[in-house]
């Protein structure tokens, strides 16, 4: 069934079923071990955004899950300054129907551009499990920030190291709420 013929509720059901499939990825243990290392961060910061969107589209996203063992999506935003469409691969956590994403920029001391895009234009879309779902971004701040960030660290422990590297600049954390 093509993506366009599905309701957003059906898309969420497909994503829920996809997320329910636990997968120890072929490279998961390696990624969890080398992911936080400076040489890997430097290398993957350049390569990941180029290859991950293509990998995520193989087999409705199942290949990326099989390869990495981590929940990945492609987020589609509108450029904050340019107004042009932008796409970025991200890891995510689920909170009910919502998606939680964080802009760590691999521990670099600046926010990634896609986070500015979401602040300027909160309407976005996520591509997960072979479907594209419209979402609205909400910046998470205050008391909710730490508990929500900890949820992401449980998925990818390297985020804790990225937080240390950023010093006094906490990464932007977003709740992506599916739209009707």
Go through the PLM ranges and name each one.
Residues 40-79, 85:
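Short, conserved active-site entrance elements at the starts or edges of catalytic domains
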Residues 61, 174-176:
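Basic, alpha-helical terminal appendages of large translation-related enzymes
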Residues 17-51:
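Membrane-proximal basic amphipathic "stem/tether" segments
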